[in-house]
């Protein structure tokens, strides 16, 4: 299967509502092979990728993930949730609560995702190598019609997650992100974002960019 590079980049957005159909081994190979083609600082390749498709392992991870989500909602996102609930008719509140429901769906159905990837890095404190690799994996999945969703919420309970996955205590391997994969039940689309000119500068911070991009330069049409 082939796909225009821009289509893959523009339409690889979080796809959390998925089917439980297994991901073929060939597709899994393409996901991992694409991941390791990403830039690697000093070509150290200080990354490890752990695939989980065993129902027992997923069942052990699911309650940990849900506890992590509870921690997320009650700490980092609590002010935004409170603000949205206080003003539910505001367009920003409506959009934010849609995100909350979507993220909660992933937690409620964590064990149902047919394939889950865990990315680990070694001495990559900036994430400059591991996250391009994870993004490559997600792009490769998109080309094969497989949806993905990235989360790092396991950071709240790393010891429990590491114990389930058998991550060694020595070696300096640190959890970076978790990505769920599955064939989506919904349609692909371009993720809504603030226009690039609202978050970009030229030559200095707050420097005038010189142009605007009011609409995505690629569309499904």
Regions of interest found by a model, annotated:
Residues 8-11, 175-221:
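C-terminal helix-cap and adjacent tail motif
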Residues 17-18, 48, 147-152:
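Short catalytic-loop micro-motif centered on adjacent basic/acidic residues
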Residues 38-44:
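Glycine-rich phosphate/pyrophosphate-binding beta-alpha loops
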Residues 5-21:
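Generic N-terminal amphipathic, Lys/Arg-enriched alpha-helix
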Residues 70-85, 165-192:
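A glycine-rich helix N-cap at a beta->alpha junction
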